[in-house]
Amino acid sequence: RFVRATFFQLTAPQQASAQESIFQAFHILNNFDIPTGTEQPWGKASADVPSATQFTVATDTQNCIIYYRTMYNSNIRCIDLKTIDFKNIRYYSMPLDNVKRQPVELINIR
């Protein structure tokens, strides 16, 4: 799997912008997601510790933005590190997802 990742990275076309590069990185990383329960014996998957790709991250180091998606929400979200006052912010943690299910948008065809 890591050989394939390297191949995709080395042969992917250069993108015009940082954001297009991030989207391309997620397309490449999609190939390596591990579905829930595939690394556990049949019927033995743990409900509280999923054996799956729990989150995927791509970082724009030029613009200091961290992009991520999770196993519960494949929409790409971002954190702009330039907006954080690291000298004054206190450590805390929070869940990456408020709801543990994929959002689905209904498209009405008229």
Question: Where do the protein language model's features map onto the residues?
Answer:
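C-terminus-biased signal that marks the final domain/tail of proteins
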Residues: R1-R110
